[in-house]
């Protein structure tokens, strides 16, 4: 099996997780990561033996002063890789694109970028095979990834005609000390539908979907209430069986575990998972309600880690990997430890 050489531009919440995930793949090699600031994350990368590059030679001076070895600049990294994963702050990826194209590398962008940055938006369970061979892909946002995992799973089994969803979004990631809110529930945005419906349609353009969102003062996870209209009547048992057997979806029983909140999910993950990451979509089992063709449920999205598996699959897709959908799911999920329970 040929090995794809990958560079990660950005070592923040998503970038660091994607970089570490790459090191666990048999068909990929992490050539290096790009860091702008010689902070604790850079020290961690250095301690793990991850080659560090800087945007330009100017930033390298500060790294060297702190004893952090620098392997070169972003341009030099691009000359050594087949694929670059752009995990820079929102909007920066579009600014970086000309540099990537000049270097002739395939690109994987994040959901904070506008869809136009890439040839297609990407979600593994929805369009992995169709995305193979693209020059660039945009992995949709954490919320959209959660919605698409659910929608494409149920659509494959029953057909989905329409979706209505209310998203309760975390206000900030744990390390984002300058974001909020800290004592408010904020319409995010105040207009309807929210951008999440538009984002879903970049992958499923045929879908009738409307979304609304608010931001709340928590850092743990997002929570969605989703109502789906299916193509045919179903029984609750059928829906639960489908979700229980689907990849990257975890059913959590509040009755069996006592878990009724995002904070309890994270607390449980702290007992058994590195960084308390939950890359699976969590569906609360008792919340699943079925009435003919209508399915309602609550689901939770760990915004720091849910897109990591999709990034790995997107790398394979742009690199024209010979792995099928089932094979990439097995390789990615097995290496990252995705499973059906928190423990």
UniProtKB/Swiss-Prot annotation:
Question: What are the entry keywords?
Answer: Cytoplasm, Glycolysis, NAD, NADP, Oxidoreductase
| Pfam families cross-referenced by the UniProt entry | DapB_N, Gp_dh_C
Q: Which NCBIfam families match?
A: GAPDH-II_archae, PRK04207.1
Its assembly, as annotated, is: Homotetramer.
Q: What class of enzyme is it?
A: oxidoreductase
List, from the UniProt record, the residues annotated as the active site of this protein. Answer: 142 (nucleophile)
Q: Name one GO cellular component term.
A: cytoplasm
Q: Which HAMAP family match?
A: G3P_dehdrog_arch
- Annotated PROSITE patterns: GAPDH
Residues engaged in binding NAD(+)? 13-14, 112, 170, 303
Pathway it works in: Carbohydrate degradation; glycolysis; pyruvate from D-glyceraldehyde 3-phosphate: step 1/5
Residues annotated as binding D-glyceraldehyde 3-phosphate are 141-143, 196-197
Q: What's the chief localization of this chain?
A: cytoplasm
An example GO BP is: lysine biosynthetic process via diaminopimelate
Q: Where in the cell is it found?
A: Cytoplasm
Source species of the chain: Aeropyrum pernix (strain ATCC 700893 / DSM 11879 / JCM 9820 / NBRC 100138 / K1)
The cross-references to CDD domains, in alphabetical order and at most eight, read: GAPDH_II_C, GAPDH_II_N
Tree of life domain: Archaea
Name recorded for this polypeptide: Glyceraldehyde-3-phosphate dehydrogenase
- Report the EC number(s), separated by commas if there are several: 1.2.1.59
- Family recorded in the similarity comment: Belongs to the glyceraldehyde-3-phosphate dehydrogenase family.
């Amino acid at each position: 099996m040929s090995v794809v050489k990958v560079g990660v531009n950005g070592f923040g919440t998503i970038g660091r997780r994607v970089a570490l995930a790459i090191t666990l793949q048999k068909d990929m090699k992490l050539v290096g990561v790009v860091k702008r600031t010689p902070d604790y994350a850079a020290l961690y990368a250095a301690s793990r033996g991850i080659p560090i590059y800087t945007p330009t030679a100017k930033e390298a001076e500060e790294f060297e002063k702190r004893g952090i070895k620098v392997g070169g600049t972003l341009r030099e990294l691009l000359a050594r890789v087949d694929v670059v994963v752009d995990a820079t702050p929102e909007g920066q990826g579009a600014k970086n694109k000309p540099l990537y194209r000049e270097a002739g590398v395939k690109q994987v962008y994040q959901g904070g970028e506008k869809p136009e940055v890439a040839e297609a938006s990407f979600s593994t369970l929805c369009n992995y095979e169709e995305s193979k061979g693209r020059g660039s892909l945009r992995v949709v946002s954490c919320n959209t990834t959660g919605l698409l995992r659910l929608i494409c799973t149920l659509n494959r089994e029953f057909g989905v005609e329409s979706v209505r969803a209310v998203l309760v979004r975390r206000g900030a990631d744990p390390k984002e000390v300058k974001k909020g809110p800290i004592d408010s529930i904020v319409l995010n945005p105040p207009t309807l539908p929210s951008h999440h419906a538009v984002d879903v349609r970049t992958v499923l353009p045929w879908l009738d979907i409307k979304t609304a969102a608010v931001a709340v003062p928590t850092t743990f996870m997002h929570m969605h209430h989703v109502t789906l209209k299916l193509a045919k009547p179903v029984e609750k048992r059928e829906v639960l069986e489908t979700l229980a057997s689907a990849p990257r979806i975890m059913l959590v029983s509040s009755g069996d575990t006592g878990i009724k909140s995002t904070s309890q999910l994270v607390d449980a993950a702290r007992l058994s998972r590195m960084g308390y990451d939950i890359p699976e979509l969590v569906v609360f089992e008792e919340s699943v309600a079925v009435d003919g063709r209508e399915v309602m449920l609550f689901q939770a999205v760990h915004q720091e880690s849910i897109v990591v598996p999709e990034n790995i699959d997107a790398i394979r897709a742009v690199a024209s990997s010979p792995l099928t959908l089932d094979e990439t799911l097995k390789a990615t999920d097995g290496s990252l430890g995705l499973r059906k329970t928190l423990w």
